[in-house]
């Protein structure tokens, strides 16, 4: 083998081999940039096309369902397909057209260097690619980076083995060769700190190693590579400098007010005027960090700005920016000075800012067929162009900040919307009192568990077309997790029963279930019977406002005063709930603690559930419902049209949104994919 290496080295000096190495680098650069800059935006755009949606819906909801659950799970593994894509692309660029081991070794290093511009392009915030949110590019960035590290490692290992077996280790003293070792060390450190266990527990270490290692690897690869990679280096440095310039130019200092909400949530407020880039769409996000007290610390923060992303819970028209923050390691200092960057737009495909008509122009604005186009609505600052008829949102924990602005905007623009919020503690409901909004469609699920917020999840039940015919399927109960089934399959509905209160025994029973769920029997009520919910399932606070006499005529008495409408009476008054005293087992101390009664203000229109939500066929049928032609107590006018053409056309105007913990977002994505629905996620996962 050593002789073959030596003969190959002699042959590799030829011009033909050098051209092959250069060609593989240019091909890798073109393919990677083409995939990122062209294929990704085109795919995102084509998903919005009605014909493409019809084909994808038929493939996901009808064809794939015939091949069993294992086949569907295999298709839904985005991580697997991304890994295969980049491994096949990198391997093909390094191997195809050459059988010489030395040429292949050199091409491995060349391809790794050629992939770096595309790797850095995927990290730009915000992404310059149309129809693309930069958060959605992070999985692709991770796997492309792993392929780069793998190819660089194989390249270095083969050359090191050759130097060792041929007695030429002295060549490692050359600047170009030991700079290659420096580049490899930077790659390995980046890969090691990028492991989930390190990245989540030691994020600061991960960030600093990632930031420093990026610059070290770019410079070391430039010195090491032969033939030179000047073009790659120019692209890499340009992308990194652009990202630094964009961040610094949109960074400002603000004073933050911290409002405690519960043991797990806090509300941060600062003036909108302090943002350099004002938000245009709801549910954008900003990146924020506590300003260092010393000048050297501030300089360091500008060089290596580690900022935390938070979704803006307020509307773009509000004068105050509000952030709902989970209490963790992020420093919360009332009236403290913070650096804030942004805002970054959410890039939700069905929503766009209205285009103002130019003075003197008679061209009408494009009207959405799903919205009321009254002059008063179009003149409102809350009016947006919305190409959706129904929106189902699922959020967990502090990600309610993503759902609240959308809930208000969609309700205002006449879009049917449901917002499912999964939280751990009912005290988190205090956050609703900080927002004056239309909460119609908000459903809250209190799990009552002691898990971390990132462990919040949602269950989903597999379904088929037979469930729309009312067939009872007792096997569905076995598909639910223990936490879902023990709460009687609390699937959200649009027509559940109501109650005015809950006694102390039932609430205490719920709390006990939360802490001993593993010892309970799995019981599940059939999904078709959920519309007749019993009184232990749901609290619908709209029942406090009786409508029995709403159609009666109003006959004012003589000298009676008409009600005066003020700005405080625009929204319906909230209801107050006094939870009973219940016991909670403290895992840290090992003792049972007792909470005191506390009055909580619950806005009207909110539905409160105890347990873990389950996305089921009933939610899918809600997505199929049409507009009601008038008020109805039975909702019989809102029936789904199961005809194939109308069925797909209706679903093309339905969107499913998810935000929050990764497990919750992934479960919602799979449910939406099985149903062939549009899906958008907002997850700041690391």
Curated annotation (Swiss-Prot):
Keyword Membrane: yes
The UniProt record lists the keyword Repeat: no
Designated gene of the protein: FRE8
Annotated binding of NAD(+), by residue: 431-439
Task performed by this protein: Is required for the uptake of Fe(3+) ions. May participate in the transport of electrons from cytoplasm to an extracellular substrate (Fe(3+) ion) via FAD and heme intermediates. Involved in iron homeostasis.
Root EC class: oxidoreductase
GO terms of molecular function: ferric-chelate reductase (NADH) activity; ferric-chelate reductase activity
Domain (Ferric oxidoreductase): residue spans on this chain: 108-666
Transmembrane intervals: 23-43, 79-99, 111-131, 147-167, 178-198, 205-225, 256-276, 392-412
Pfam family, one: Ferric_reduct
Compartments reported by the entry: Membrane
Name recorded for this polypeptide: Probable ferric reductase transmembrane component
Membrane protein topology class: Multi-pass membrane protein
Names of the cofactor(s): FAD
EC number, UniProt record: 1.16.1.7
Keyword terms, alphabetized: Electron transport, FAD, Flavoprotein, Glycoprotein, Ion transport, Iron, Iron transport, Membrane, NAD, Oxidoreductase, Transmembrane, Transmembrane helix, Transport
Catalytic activity: 2 a Fe(II)-siderophore + NAD(+) + H(+) = 2 a Fe(III)-siderophore + NADH
Chain positions recorded as FAD binding sites: 308-314
Disulfide bonds: none
